[in-house]
Amino acid sequence: MSSFHQNSSYMEDADYPGYSGSRNHTHNYLETQDYPEFPGSQNNPGFHHPRSNPHSSGSRTNPDYPYFQEEPDYPGSLSNTVYQDTRSHPFSAHSRTRPDYESSIEPDYNDFRSESYHAGLPMEPDYPGSQSHPGFAGVGRSSMNYTGPRTNLGYLGSLEEPDYPGAQDNSYYHSGSRPHSNLPGSRRDAGYAGSRINSYPDDLGEPDYPGAENQPNSPRFYGKPDYPGAEEGDGYSSSKSLAVIRRGNGPFGMLGRRNEDYPEGIGMVSMEMAGDPRNGYVNPAYTRRISPVCPDRNLLLCAHDWHTSVQGQKLIASLIPMTTRDRIKTIRNQPRTMQEKRELRKIVDKEKNKQSHGILEANCCAQCLGSLSLTYRRTRNGLSELLNYITLWQKRFKVIGGKFGTSVLSYFSFLRWLLKFNIFSFVMNFSFIIIPQFTVGAKNTLQFTGLEFFTGAGYFGDTVMYYGFYTNSTIRHRMGGASYNMQLAYIFTIGACLVVCFFSLLFSMAKYFRNNFINPHIYSRGIAKLIFCWDFTVTHEKAVKLKQKNLSTEIRENLSELRQENYRLTFNQQLTRFSAHVAAWLVSTGVTAACCVAVYYLAEYNSEFLKTHRNPGAVLLLPFVVSCINLAVPRFYSMFRLVERYEIPRQEVYVLLVRNIFLKISIVGILCYYWLNIVALSGEECWETLIGQDIYRLLLMDFVFSLADSLLGEFLRRLIGMKFTSLSLQEFDIARNVLELIYAQTLTWLGIFFCPLLPFIQMITLFIMFYVKNVSLMMNFQPPSKAWRASQMITFFIFLLFFPSFTGVLCTLAITIWRLKPSADCGPFRGLPSFIQSIYSWIDTLSRRPGYLWVVWIYQNLIGSVHFFFILTLIVLIITYLYWQITEGRKVMIRLLHEQIINEGKDKMFLIEKLTKLQDMEKRVNPSALDLERREVEPQIPLHLEELGAAPDLRLRRSAQEENPIA
């Protein structure tokens, strides 16, 4: 029956001697490989109508047979003349060729799939239970009002659209137009024998039960041999198995070839439900609605039975002898889902434990070490995920980066990086300096007026905020107990903070340099990340929009870099640009020099004025002027872009950064010169506290100006841009804002010796400035008009912070500690000739104790030796040069490898073109060979691909039958 629908004859029957699937064509069909010869078999010589008997009257090989090799001759066959109900008999009551035959070519059961009814065709079976049997329930199909045909507009499943659950055009589940799911004849009626829920794709080859994907172990489809021993039979483990008798429970019984008592009842298509447990075959779609199916039988591992397949067992066997690291790496590289990888790892571990059960004691230490290593990795990964989750401002960073790009985001990243420095410095100072001082500090008797917040003097002068409040005595709480030397604690704590900052800056520069300068994205530009980086776990609408903005911004940055590489200037344009750059540098340098001179003379004048006038507000004059200069001059520098016209935004930012840092560091350098040569030598009572108060006022005034500029200045600029459309909205000035951070951090490091609480003040200002800048950015600024990647900006920011800011601070503090004399009446170093003298005294004390002579040797030969520092500096320079050469070599190697990849791609394209030309030439010379090769390839098409084209093929076949019923 199955082959009939495909070929309109029984030529493809597995019983036929010329059948292509027969394994023994030369030894008669009786000797076909492993075919059972049960009683009643057509191949049984005792059977009275064996088709293999050439002298049988009904044999198809008998030349006298009227339908020689055309029609099957088993009882009930279409051409069997003795069969009463044969449809080929012109006078049979149920013959389709009879003039008064009611039924058409198409089956007339209620779940009939045809689009119209037609005249009868003598090639359709009409035995009882047949789809075309006239006694079938319902009116004949010759009636146009028949409720079953799909040409009836009232029929629920008309026009050949699948109406089973999950169908794409099933309106029953959406619009409710198919309310009767159990209507007799409906394909959704599971109890009906011809229902399409039947997994055996007898009805036009496509099962429609829920979740059906043509299970590989299900009974065979039409056109494929399904008897035991068939070559393509997946459902049978042996070719020598007995005949599979499928019992039926249809409403009309199982007559004809479906009857198990019938001689040819082998491998016939059953009308029974696939999920009926009595059959022994349980459809996975009913037991597991979403069972993964492996449509391709040649895959390495199938989703549901990968561990039982040969390939799966080989993979498991190859993973067992591997080390833990190699096994994890191999499993990670498998093209499987995470769930399948976990299951594979569990199976391998289980098998490995079984094999290693006998040598468990010998490998106990190795297993313990492996368990500890695994626990350590998991703990480290968990802590890393936790730190990433609780990282400060992580969500806000994503929003900023998505809307304004990495260039603007670099400012906020730098701000957060500076905040970490100040938190560390504050914790160190608070733990080792401030807390011990609280235990011995005297009560402050000065009155607090509120003006101290701006001036830093008055009430704050007699607190732990400034250097002059700290004691110079050794703290002891009881006689004979432990002592705490405040001089050593003060200088070692400040020194430790600066040393940690020094190495942190070095390592940070090295890390960012490695990530941003030695980067394969220089050549690939991260195109793969842009294409494959979408996170399908993101379902929230707001998060999806943010992700889209991030991707669009990165694409714009990539395109901008590509345009910049292809941009070239003529000689005249280059000469004009060079002249503009030189003029801008000359003007900016002159403005910086003028500002430095003005600040120096203002500081001297203000000092003389304060000696004669005790006005508390007069101390704010110098910080106010310096802050005005820092606010106005960088904006003046920003106007140079109209003349210089940089095509690459990164170059413009770098130039502005250098000009602004030169301005700010020059002003700070002039102030340091003023403090160390004027204030420190003026004979003031506590000059260290005065310097600390000046630095506090500068830092506070800079914060106030930045706050006012963000809340008022940028807001007014936005209103002006909205009023005058020619000006448009402003863009975030990265160079100016970053220089404000560098300037403030330089003052913090410079004043940490004179004002130990200055890191705490800077920490508060940075925290407030982040939120203020964030709000101002979202309200008052537009995204950069020229998108550009700022991956190297953080490295440049840290470099500017290290040099000249941090190195300048170290030089200033070194001069203070080694050259200047402390105040005689305040501070922990009072009465000493220099600050470093406290270290000398401590070393002399240790030299008289035999147990601490190693400390004395280290100080005298390493720390206090000029030769040691010279050798150390030379070693550092040599190592730096070597690493620089290694870096350059890696850059060259990366470039060569990139070129090699490009050349290999070109070679492959060349070979593909050559192969295509050769195939075209061979096709023109010998087209028959290609047709033969195509025929050999077509049977290898996967089953699920055949099913996709099955329904259209049947429709075309029915159309041909309609046009020529006799054919």
Swiss-Prot record:
Biased composition (Polar residues): 1-10, 21-31, 53-62, 168-184
Membrane protein topology class: Multi-pass membrane protein
Chief location category: membrane
Subcellular location: Membrane
Positions of the UniProt region annotated as Disordered: 1-240
Keywords noted in UniProt: Membrane, Transmembrane, Transmembrane helix
UniProt-listed InterPro entries: TMC, TMC_dom
Spans traversing the lipid bilayer: 421-441, 450-470, 488-508, 582-602, 617-637, 661-681, 695-715, 750-770, 797-817, 862-882
Short name of one Pfam family: TMC
Keyword flag rRNA-binding: no
Residues exposed to the Extracellular side: 1-420, 471-487, 603-616, 682-694, 771-796, 883-967
Cytoplasmic topological segments: 442-449, 509-581, 638-660, 716-749, 818-861
Signal peptide limits: none
Coiled coil among keywords: no
Tissues where this protein is expressed: Ubiquitously expressed.
One GO CC term on file: plasma membrane
The family this protein is said to belong to: Belongs to the TMC family.
Function: Probable component of an ion channel. Molecular function hasn't been characterized yet.
The protein, known as: Transmembrane channel-like protein 5
Protein encoded by which gene: Tmc5
